[in-house]
From Swiss-Prot:
Its cofactor is Ca(2+). Binds 1 Ca(2+) ion per subunit. This is Annulin. Participates in morphogenetic activities of the cells, maybe by stabilizing the membrane or subcortical structures of cells that are under mechanical stress. Probably catalyzes the cross-linking of proteins and the conjugation of polyamines to proteins. Has an annular, or ring-like expression pattern in epithelial annuli of developing limb segment boundary cells. In embryos, it is seen in gastrulating cells, in cells surrounding rapidly dividing neuroblasts, and in muscle pioneer cells invaginating to form apodemes.
């Protein structure tokens, strides 16, 4: 029979029942793993195509129209699918096609002769590259017959002939809206109807991503501005600092850069262990990557470190974005040292956006770490006003950062009138085990707000982070009973923040996680959560306070590092008849942002008589010389006051967070940025310290900068003086762009700045050589 079989085993009939009536069997030539496929004929025996206009002799059987060339139309598909910025699509050597599921992409197929729909049948065979045993049932193997325009079937996948000109076909292929996300291989089988077939294997794999523009996709998000922000924006802001001094820090997500998409898929499949057949499910994928981004269980992307000793790695505060972290991990396949919560969240957001998942980074201030699922955070205080770290298993972080991912939750039935689709909290910081792995989420944010803490996954933990009550107990010794000295129902879960859509400003999303404090709805949600968590705690500890003496902190909240600051406790006697003697212990400690006290800076113990109706104050003045040797990463302090009112059984304890502010790097462009043209810029920093800054270094990332620029200063920066560095970059694309800068030195670290600007399109050149 030669190289083209005259028989065709019709095992799979993709268009049976759709009116086509053409039984097609997906086959493949070359080194296929399917033994029943048909071999591709050697080039020497393929008949020459007829000349244009030739009419085959009625007595001569036409040859199979074999595929000669396939063009995946990178530029056209990149624009249509909003994937043109992926380095895979844009690189000079061996570019790859990246498309989104549920949306047609175009290919141009050149045949060995003109296509005749009366005698020719064409079928596309798509296979998930990582599938060990591709199968139709698991969706890792798909056969799609070519149909005429207007004859689209109701099948999940479709291939439609858009147009034809002689031997060139333009075909629109639509992957299913729930297609597996990952790398796919494409084969094209051609045959004569009722005769044998030959197969063509396209040389390169292509990528299918989630498609939040597709209404049938589980991650569909309506609103172009939202999609531009949460899928396509490669730069964002992550909030750090404290609830009373919010600090926005620029973060380069870099989801389109070299190796980022491949690394994201590696984290899903190899580290996260998601089977190919499950890679279309965003719930399964997000839960897996929340563990894969951290390292304790599976040697994932980032190793956490909260010790303040970062030997052998990069301090978390020195990262400017996700690109270098993920590229280093993908190259070495070892966890990158080191990260803390905002690094884990920034990397997770990058991975999600690279895969096509709408994602945003979210910060909660005064976030509870409730290890006992009690919905309270209990602190024990000794007679010196110190928090007893050895007795505290819970903690309150100055801030905590996680990621929200947008998706429907078909795995959850609606309950109590709530629909659980929308934003889902996903946390990759390794804090607590969930199903025996360090991961958290996806937890429906609406379930958190309603107190539905049993809704998967980890809603109870997220609820406690933003709703737990803070309780302080006075510890007087192992034989003495604990004494309740303060409770705080309002301090946890403040100023929940994310970057605003289309603006480099803060959007407060606290109301998406919780009802207003002390509202009827908020208390109802808390009581529901307490019942569902079977907590032993109740509200019986909410006793009446002693109200004759009112205590209040007065603290300036805009102190630049290098400057002195003062802490004042004001005590007002509200009684018109009774004098009171009060002993006040006031202390200032440096604290890690996780809430753990590091070093004592200064303390004062005084006794004051406060006459009826009078006001007294206790003050501590703290100089730079007092605190600079004790500073830790976030320049955060814990201010604590323990006051004992004599002749009563009342003790007052309060604490507050405070941080000194770092200066900002100023960035200035020299000229108007134009696509494809080299630009110059200047980054400037002023030294706010009373001492010189030595061996300073700038890190720069921006449009067209493939590798982070490191610029070392050759001279010290004297107190009050400025240092500037020049750098160049060439924007590859027009539109909005951002330059991000970091500065570090021994004396002054974790300083950043950014500049957001517009890049003009490349100017067209007319025939005279002038710009049109």
């Amino acid at each position: 029979m030669g190289n083209c079989c005259s028989t065709f085993r019709a095992v799979f009939k993709p268009n049976e029942g759709s009116g086509g009536g053409i039984p097609l069997m997906p086959v493949r030539g070359g080194s296929t793993r399917r033994p029943d496929s048909l071999p591709k004929p050697p080039a020497a025996v393929v008949p020459s195509p007829p000349s244009p206009g030739d009419v085959p002799d009625a007595g001569v059987a036409p040859e199979v129209a074999s595929v000669k060339e396939v063009d995946v139309l990178l530029a056209e598909n990149g624009d249509a699918h909003r994937t043109r910025h992926y380095e895979l699509m844009d690189r000079e050597k061996e570019p790859r096609l990246v498309v989104r599921r549920g949306q047609p992409f175009a290919v141009s197929v050149t045949l060995s002769r003109p296509y005749n729909p009366d005698i020719d049948a064409i079928s596309f065979v798509f296979t998930v590259e990582d599938a060990e045993k591709p199968s139709y049932g698991q969706g890792t193997l798909v056969a799609v017959p070519l149909l005429a325009k207007g004859a689209e079937s109701g099948a999940a996948w479709n291939a439609v002939l858009d147009s034809s000109a002689d031997d060139i076909l333009r075909i629109q292929i639509t992957p299913a809206a729930d297609a597996i996300v990952g790398k796919w291989k494409m084969d094209i089988d051609t045959k004569l109807k009722n005769d044998g077939a030959v197969s063509y294997s396209y040389k390169d794999p292509f990528y299918i991503l989630y498609n939040p523009w597709c209404r049938q996709d589980q991650v569909f998000l309506e609103g172009e501005e939202l999609l531009q922000e949460y899928v396509l924006n490669d730069t964002g802001l992550i909030w750090r600092g404290s609830y009373n001094r919010l600090r926005p820090c620029v973060w380069k997500y870099a989801q389109f850069e070299k190796e980022i998409l491949d690394c994201a898929l590696y984290l899903v499949s190899k580290i996260g262990g998601v089977r190919p057949s499950e890679c279309g499910d965003p719930v399964r994928v997000c839960r897996a990557i929340s563990a894969a981004v951290n390292s304790p269980d599976d040697n994932g992307a980032v190793m956490g470190n909260w010790s303040n000793d970062y030997g052998g790695g990069t301090p978390p505060t020195k990262w400017i974005g996700s690109m270098k972290i993920l590229q280093q991990f993908y190259k070495n396949k070892k966890p990158v040292k080191y990260g803390q919560c905002w690094v884990f969240a920034g990397v997770l957001t990058t991975v999600c956006r690279a895969l096509g998942l709408p994602a945003r980074t979210v910060t909660t201030y005064s976030a509870a770490h409730d290890t006992q699922n009690s919905l309270t955070v209990d602190y024990f205080v000794d007679d010196k006003g110190e928090i007893m770290e050895e007795m505290n298993s819970d903690s309150i972080w100055n801030f905590h950062v996680w990621t929200e991912v947008w998706m429907e939750r078909p795995d959850l039935m609606p309950g109590d009138g709530a629909h659980y689709g929308g934003w889902q909290a996903v946390d990759s910081t390794p804090q607590e085990l969930s199903d025996n792995m360090y991961r958290c989420g996806p937890a429906p944010v609406v379930a958190v707000k309603q107190g539905e803490v049993l809704r998967p996954y980890d809603s109870a933990y997220v609820f406690a982070e933003v709703n737990a009550d803070k309780v302080f107990w006075r510890y007087s010794g192992p034989t003495q009973p604990l004494k309740l000295i303060r409770k705080d129902m309002l301090g946890i879960g403040q100023n929940i923040s994310t970057k605003a859509v289309g603006r480099f400003q803060r959007e407060d999303i606290t109301n998406t996680y919780k009802y207003p404090e002390k509202s009827v709805e908020e208390r109802a949600a808390m009581l529901k959560a307490l019942r569902q968590s079977e907590s032993l705690f109740s509200r019986y500890y909410l006793n009446e306070d002693f109200n004759d003496i009112h205590f209040n902190f007065e603290l300036r909240d805009d102190i630049v590092i290098g400057s002195p600051f003062s802490v004042v406790v004001v005590m007002k006697n509200r009684s018109n008849q009774q004098d009171y003697t009060v002993t006040v212990l006031l202390r200032v400690d440096t604290v890690l942002y996780t809430g753990h006290v590091k070093d004592g800076v200064k303390k004062e113990k005084v006794e004051r008589l406060i006459k009826a109706g009078a006001v007294e104050e206790v003050r501590i003045d703290v100089s730079y010389e007092d605190y600079y040797k004790h500073l830790v990463d976030q320049c955060a302090f814990n201010i604590a006051c323990l006051a004992t009112v004599h002749d009563t059984n009342y003790e007052y304890f309060a604490q507050d967070d405070f941080r000194v502010r770092k200066p900002d790097i100023k960035i200035k462009l020299e000229g108007e940025p134009v696509q494809g043209q080299e630009m110059s810029a200047v980054a400037t920093l002023k030294n706010p310290l009373p001492i010189p800054v030595k061996k300073g270094q700038f890190l720069i990332e921006g449009p067209g900068i493939a590798k982070t620029q490191k610029i070392k200063l050759s001279q010290n920066i004297a107190p009050g003086e400025e240092a500037s560095v020049n750098f160049k970059f060439t924007p590859k694309y027009d539109g909005r762009a951002t330059i991000a800068a970091k500065f570090s030195s021994k004396e002054l670290d974790d300083v950043d700045g950014f500049l957001n600007f517009m890049v003009e399109p490349k100017k067209e050149v007319n025939g005279t050589g002038n710009a049109a």
